[in-house]
Amino acid sequence: MNEHNPIYGVNPNPTPSNDTFDFVMPDIPEPPQNEKPEPKDRDSVGFKFGFIGAGQGGGKLAETFSQIGYARVGVINTADQDLATINVPNKMKFGEQQGAGKNREFAKQAFLNSKEDVVDFIKSSIGTDIDRIFVTVGAGGGTGAGVCSELVKTVKEYQNTIKAGSPYVGLILALPKLSEGKKVSQNAYETLKEACELVEQKIVSPLIILDNERINSLYPKLSVNKFWQVANANICSLFHLFNNIITKNSQYSTFDTNDFRTVLDSGIMVFGAANIINVSSESEISKAVRENLKRNVLCGELDLSTGSTAAAVAICDEKTLDSIPQEYLDNAFNQLNRTLKTNSTVHQGVYKGVKEGLSIFTAIGGIATPVDKLDALLKASQ
């Protein structure tokens, strides 16, 4: 007699022996494999960048890149409350407690305990069609400062696994104001020191430092809301301009993908911008380049004279292009070259735009470790 089994069905040839287990394999339905499409950035860009923000400050930076139009963005944090304030589609809470309480070691251990989950999150948020991933952190807190080095190394491993376009991991580090207290300054000192070591080890490039103390001194009357908007908009907008401009053609002088890659691969990096509405003399352009460097809100206490490579892009409306001699721009670019160390390289680009006047955007790379800034943070922590 054939017995019916609700799982295996009916065996048409039952065996009388108890020594053999013969059965019909059940048909087990498998869930459909829905492949997630690769993210697509909103604007035309030369490089496919991804951004993983850690902590509240790093999360806000990553959110700003998302608002600009970058699609490969994810944010991790030890606190649900902080994640709730970040408007990005990909967010992950790690660790068993809520927040790190400015404790770098606590955040680091929580990250290590969740490392494989974070790798899965990176893959889900960033995908595999990527040139370089940037880690964004605030150096003064607990979560971002605590996980910074380990997150960078994890991203490096992930990039190697998927054969990303670059061997380097980008790092954007927001330094706190010195008035935020000794513990915050201590966290920032340790995090910046580790970040510079990662640059020396050829793991991180570029390292972009956003110095909130510098912003505070340049814009002392900014409201609380506008302060963070200015801080994040400066770095994100300038960064995007260079990544976007390398996709544009120019009949004058083109700043291309390889030019930008050279600066990105040079280590510590800083951006600047200057606008001139009415260009009446050569000295105006040269002065704009100088002021561009002096008033750079991202610079802090970096020694730009140690820079080894730079990009300088001039964008003018048609009227300005018709009126200023080429010699004016050449001399301005040469002045930038003289600002850097001997045998440096300045990659140039000249483009026609719609905004009235002349705008000059700069990116300087290969800058030496900011010893003065490290000393200032160490002193503030004592």
Would you name each region that the model predicts?
Residues 2-382:
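Tubulin/FtsZ superfamily GTPase core signature
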